[in-house]
Amino acid sequence: MSFKNRGDYNFTPRNVVSRNSVFFMCLASFCLGMFFTNRMWNIVPEARGISRLSKLSLSSSDCDKKNVLDYGNNTIGILDKSISNLEMKLVAARAERESLSGKFNISNEAKKRKYFMVIGINTAFSSRKRRDSVRSTWMPQGENLKKLEEEKGIIVRFVIGHSVLSHGILDKAIEAEEKTHGDFLRLEHTEGYMKLSAKTKTFFATAVSLWDAEFYIKVDDDVHVNLASLKKALSAHQNKPRVYVGCMKSGPVLARKSVKYHEPEYWKFGEVGNKYFRHATGQFYAISKDLATYILINQDLLHKYANEDVSLGSWFIGLNVEHVDEKRLCCSTSQDCELKAMMGHVCAASFDWKCSGICRSAERMADVHERCGEPQNALWTSNS
């Protein structure tokens, strides 16, 4: 190949590359480029795949760790609950031993057995006629009282402490009555109207120490009770751990000293004219075993207000307790309980609100029993 310069001289270089060589060099470069490019594209997805697998592996590892932690936390929670229950039982057992310490003669069989309910009938030294009216109506006597315990799991006792002069004439009268009927629970408590809160606390602590039951009940000796209907009403709450059953009310806090239910600590409930927190009326209420055990363990710490029903309500107000407003426990004796009995909806407990019990109960209990009582064999023929 020749070139012509400005001076018109022909010039032919020796090292000039031919067109064919250039073409083959370009083709070779292109092929090499394609080869390396394809190889790099193969490497990148592999790297991305490895990265994705690593992330999945890490994610799976994190999930496994979370599951292990959740399982561990749940297990710890269950163990904590079990330990708390065991601690409560241990404290209750210690309190039981200290509370009883050989004061009561209860058979080992009675201690081991599970009862449905323990009914404590609050009574006083002067209430012999009331007790006799209860014995002649709704409270079984003699062998039937034992049969009630053995077949139906129901304990019924009149509850009373001792007089100021221990072993005095009043105490001896109760001892003689006990020999005849065998239906008393004597408490380590000095009797007195202004000491009802202390008596209630001592009753529940003593009862839960003596008998293992689903429910513990306090009822006044001027209230009529239908035992089969009562058992039916409480059976609906049998599997609840902390339940407080009664006719719930919220009356005014009485600040004046001249009134019957005066509350000396009225200032704790706020301004004058305020009402009490919701609590069961004092004529009749029932609590589950856990709550009775709570009273047993903490009896030295629980504050006592002037009125025992308010005191009981105050002990539960800050706890995780289910309050059950059960109107079958507070029927009126005028026409209410009779009409309900005729309709087949027998009341569990009946009294007169105006008298805070059955008015002249020693005289009228038999009449109320005839009008408002359940069928004679209702308790014995029931399946429960």
Swiss-Prot record:
PANTHER family attached to this UniProt entry: BETA-1,3-GALACTOSYLTRANSFERASE 1-RELATED (PTHR11214:SF343), BETA-1,3-N-ACETYLGLUCOSAMINYLTRANSFERASE (PTHR11214)
Q: List, alphabetically, the GO terms of the cellular component aspect.
A: Golgi membrane
Annotated source species: Arabidopsis thaliana (Mouse-ear cress)
Annotated keywords: Glycoprotein, Glycosyltransferase, Golgi apparatus, Manganese, Membrane, Signal-anchor, Transferase, Transmembrane, Transmembrane helix
Q: What does this protein do?
A: Beta-1,3-galactosyltransferase that transfers galactose from UDP-galactose to substrates with a terminal glycosyl residue.
User: What cofactor is needed?
Assistant: Mn(2+)
Enzyme class per UniProt: transferase
- InterPro entries, sorted: DUF4094 (IPR025298), Glyco_trans_31 (IPR002659)
Q: How does it sit in the membrane?
A: Single-pass type II membrane protein
Q: Where can this protein be found? A: Golgi apparatus membrane
Q: Which domain of life is it from?
A: Eukaryota
**Known EC number(s)?**
2.4.1.-
Gene this protein is translated from: B3GALT1
Which chain regions cross the lipid bilayer? 21-43
Which residues, renumbered to this chain, are glycosylated? N73, N105
What protein name applies here? Probable beta-1,3-galactosyltransferase 1
